[in-house]
């Protein structure tokens, strides 16, 4: 995180950006700024406009109106090639590496010959503390290291503006810490990072500034240290008058009051030797008034278990739900 308030001109300044799809206003005059050595976190619910704004900055989608100021020059629209030339690189949530190619081949893929510099690559690896075997296959890397290879692809192209889309979504806490350590080293070189995430604790740890998008607008923006968690949550999910709610929104508001109440410690869900696709012999009990955390690496079976409990997948074993008027029991051989 940047600790000094003395900054050069912004790396990126988006002004009054508008975008419409089929008559629906997706972006409504967005202003967004990124400085050197800064992490600017971008939050918002699904459909808030985050992805559209980043696609416009990366040259994937044109804006209907507005300007992007980069390096002191104004642009009405960019192409992906032009964005790369201006030093903008989008790192997707799922790294787009070729698993059967080496790490070196992945980093250099698609680069012009004049940009191919092994010494530059080695310098970047050393600066970021990466100890890759450049000749090993990219498919052998864990998710955190794949993210770093994607970032290195951008840095080899002299990118100064990195857009990280949910970079920790598939990472364990240890992998997240390793990624953050390398990002801090990267920030010291003057790179600016747009960090898209829904994880507030991580955002508070890594971000200098936070902007919250809602319904195509910037609902809240400021220094991380000056924004409370309540402010951020309220900006993401504001209280609105009932008359402006849709029927489905009203239903969701009514549901909590209609749920049966149980004394704390009363079992509301019990699993006994539950087996399904991606998991086996899972036994656990969820009690009223508690939050039961389910942790594991990517592919450990967490999603499959949740989908089985919801009824989307077949199961073998025993499930008992006690929260209904009468206990509900379901078992399969």
Curated annotation (Swiss-Prot):
The alphabetical list of record keywords is:
ATP-binding, Nucleotide-binding
By its UniProt entry, which InterPro entries does this protein fall under? AAA+_ATPase, ABC_carbohydrate_import_ATPase, ABC_transporter-like_ATP-bd, P-loop_NTPase
State one Pfam family annotation: ABC_tran
Limits of the ABC transporter domain: 12-240
Task: List, in alphabetical order, the Gene Ontology terms for molecular function in this entry.
Answer: ATP binding; ATP hydrolysis activity
Where on the tree of life does the source sit, at the highest rank?
A: Bacteria
Residues reported to bind ATP: 44-51
Q: Which family does it belong to?
A: Belongs to the ABC transporter superfamily. AI-2 autoinducer porter (TC 3.A.1.2.8) family.
The name on file for this protein is Putative autoinducer 2 import ATP-binding protein LsrA homolog
Q: Which organism is it from?
A: Escherichia coli O139:H28 (strain E24377A / ETEC)
